[in-house]
């Protein structure tokens, strides 16, 4: 008997958005191959699938595969396994990723390279591996998970945001390249979504957590704001899974799928008003929230402290100039 269920490969399926989407799609008659990084994640995916009755040979199917997106050998082995078992890959959903929080000066190049290996190059390599199969069948769908951070830059996430800007651009390029062979590409752009993984480990840069860092005060304020936004956010991983299902089943999927009214509003504003105006709006909403709280030791707001530091630097430069004169 021919198995005509759509075959989807989902990376990062051991937790968070990837786990939720794997279970959601399997429950809607997709044959899901979910990649996981660790034994614990593999166990979590298998147990949750079994609990929901999503057996490998039943109506819904979830198969866990160990894969590190930074290793080409893992990628090739995974793709070969799916082609051998299922005969094709109808869709790929890229969820595997990591965070990196901290001001640029506090990020080590090792931390940044590791981030790009997973969040950017991992997407590129896996896409390269599946495209020949999709191209040969003249059919396929690719979903790249970006972020609100790929549309708007913000302090304290310069490394992460720059990587997300990169994959948004990648998605737009692939959209045109894939169309030549009926491979449809979409970019999923959620805002802040609380998941257990995000709540436990935001992957803060080592130097960013050092109280001697010149950015430490602002970094802590920004993290506090993120906590508040997460607490107020109503979107869940299951909501994102629903959007993924919509992308994979739409007759003509769009390029961009932004999740959240506020995100859509901010991106629309950025696109239609002069950037200088948008920058002022963004400064009032975000930058001043970070800069204005009073420092417990000095009594100054972060903004005042920053102005004070700049004033000191200017005074020092003037003094040095007079000495040289």
Q: Whereabouts are the PLM-identified features?
A:
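Conserved glycine-rich Rossmann-like NAD(P)H-binding loop of the short-chain dehydrogenase/reductase
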Residues: 28-44
């Amino acid at each position: 008997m021919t198995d005509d269920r759509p075959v989807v490969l989902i990376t990062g399926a051991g937790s968070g958005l990837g786990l939720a989407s794997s279970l959601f799609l399997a429950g809607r008659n997709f044959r899901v191959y979910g990649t996981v990084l660790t034994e614990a994640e593999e166990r979590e995916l298998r147990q949750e699938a079994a609990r929901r009755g999503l057996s490998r040979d039943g109506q819904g199917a979830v198969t866990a595969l160990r894969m590190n997106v930074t290793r080409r050998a893992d990628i090739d082995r995974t793709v070969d396994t799916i082609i051998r078992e299922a005969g094709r890959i109808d869709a790929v959903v890229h969820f595997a990723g990591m965070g990196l929080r901290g001001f640029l000066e506090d990020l080590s190049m090792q931390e940044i390279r590791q981030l790009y290996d997973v969040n950017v190059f991992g997407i590129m390599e896996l896409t390269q591996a599946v495209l020949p199969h999709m191209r040969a069948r003249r059919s396929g769908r690719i979903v790249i998970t970006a972020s609100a951070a790929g549309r708007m830059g913000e302090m304290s996430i310069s490394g992460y945001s720059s990587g997300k800007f990169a994959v948004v651009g990648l998605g737009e390029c692939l959209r045109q390249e894939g169309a030549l062979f009926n491979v449809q590409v979409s970019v999923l752009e959620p805002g802040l979504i609380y998941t257990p993984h995000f709540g436990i480990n935001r992957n803060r840069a080592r130097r960013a957590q050092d109280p001697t860092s010149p950015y430490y005060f602002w970094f802590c304020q920004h993290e506090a704001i993120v906590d508040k936004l997460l607490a107020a956010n109503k979107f869940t991983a299951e909501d994102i899974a629903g959007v993924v299902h919509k992308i994979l089943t739409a007759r003509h999927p769009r390029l961009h799928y932004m999740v959240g009214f506020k995100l859509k509003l901010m991106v629309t504003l950025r696109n239609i008003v002069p950037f200088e105006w948008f920058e002022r709006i963004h400064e009032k909403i975000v930058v001043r929230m970070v800069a204005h709280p009073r420092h417990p030791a000095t009594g100054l707001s972060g903004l005042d402290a920053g102005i004070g530091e700049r004033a000191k630097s200017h005074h020092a430069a003037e003094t040095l100039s007079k000495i040289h004169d």
